[in-house]
Amino acid sequence: MCYNRESNFANQTIDFYCYTEYNGFMTTKGANVMTEVEMKEQVQEVLDKLRPFLLRDGGDCELVDVDEGIVKLRLLGACGSCPSSTITLKAGIERALLEEVPGVVEVEQVF
């Protein structure tokens, strides 16, 4: 549950207080508010940068959805059946998305 104290929608910055069951109250000042469409576009850009590395090993990935910061990906080709796909997903793709796309909290594989 979040409560807006001050908003500046022209710059899409917001100062709000948020209560979560995980970490209690927290304050975020000047956080960028990104639409779901913008987040999907940024996620796709990062995936496009990573794609050559996946293709080199005979694999690929497809963006299925982004919902509340959770990126859902389908691993394709060799990546779909590779025993190392979890490592590729978590240590490679998820790490890159967490670093480069604000608001991403997790990456999940869908089948």
Curated annotation (Swiss-Prot):
This protein's record includes keyword Glycosyltransferase: no
Keyword Zinc-finger: no
Keywords: Nitrogen fixation
GO biological process, one term: nitrogen fixation
UniProt-recorded Gene Ontology molecular function terms: iron ion binding; iron-sulfur cluster binding
Name of one Pfam family that matches: NifU
Disulphide bond pairs: none
Family the UniProt entry places it in: Belongs to the NifU family.
Biological role stated in the UniProt entry: May be involved in the formation or repair of [Fe-S] clusters present in iron-sulfur proteins.
PANTHER family the UniProt entry points to: IRON-SULFUR CLUSTER SCAFFOLD PROTEIN NFU-RELATED, NIFU-LIKE PROTEIN 3, CHLOROPLASTIC
Identification of the protein by name: Putative nitrogen fixation protein YutI
Annotated source species: Bacillus subtilis (strain 168)
Encoding gene per record: yutI
